[in-house]
């Protein structure tokens, strides 16, 4: 009986197309090429590449920021409000900390809880300190740590396709989404 099952399994594998056996390599221009280990708000180990297969909004922030970073979150929430339930289910929102010294998973979870972020769609990530600059470079975020521990930084939402390629970017933040960027989000979700 075991031999028969093994033979059937072998035959099925032989009939599968090669694409079904191995995932295609990442595109050369994919942000997911950056192999930076991180932990999420639940302390689970992850990388950017685990977001593959789902359109993403990505930004960088830090949890102790009182001014601009809350607007980054507001911007993600405002975009979500403009989406249908089906569109929302196909979108992920990823916020990457630029302050891993202070932004441990507990700090990330406090922000997610306080802001009532749906963790089926939102992911807050803590990279290793040595990877912050590379991550910022990939997403076009400039930052500088100040003497008081705060950061000067560009604030942007970056739209990625399901393969991690940058499709669009906006620096318009707040409760009213950038209409051109929102149209790009909807287009990316429709082509998915």
What are these regions (language model features)?
Residues 19-34:
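N-proximal helix/coil linker or "cap" segments that precede and/or mark the start of modular domains
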Residues 146-192:
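Thiol-/selenol-based redox modules, centered on thioredoxin-like
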């Amino acid at each position: 009986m075991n031999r028969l099952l093994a033979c059937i399994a072998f035959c099925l594998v032989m009939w599968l197309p090669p694409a079904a056996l191995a995932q295609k390599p990442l595109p050369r221009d994919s942000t997911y090429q950056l192999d930076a280990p991180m932990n999420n708000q639940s302390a689970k180990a992850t990388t950017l590449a685990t977001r593959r297969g789902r359109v993403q909004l990505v930004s960088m922030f830090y949890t102790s920021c009182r001014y601009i970073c809350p607007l980054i979150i507001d911007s993600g929430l405002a975009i979500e409000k403009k989406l249908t339930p089906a569109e929302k289910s196909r979108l992920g929102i990823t916020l990457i900390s630029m302050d891993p010294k202070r932004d441990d998973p507990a700090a990330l979870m406090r922000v997610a809880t306080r802001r009532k972020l749906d963790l089926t769609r939102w992911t807050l990530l803590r990279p290793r300190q040595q990877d912050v600059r590379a991550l910022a470079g990939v997403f076009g975020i400039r930052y500088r740590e100040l003497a008081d521990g705060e950061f000067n930084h560009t604030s942007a939402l970056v739209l990625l396709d399901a393969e991690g390629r940058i499709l669009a970017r906006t620096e318009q933040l707040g409760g009213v989404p950038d209409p051109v960027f929102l149209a790009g989000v909807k287009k990316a979700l429709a082509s998915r």
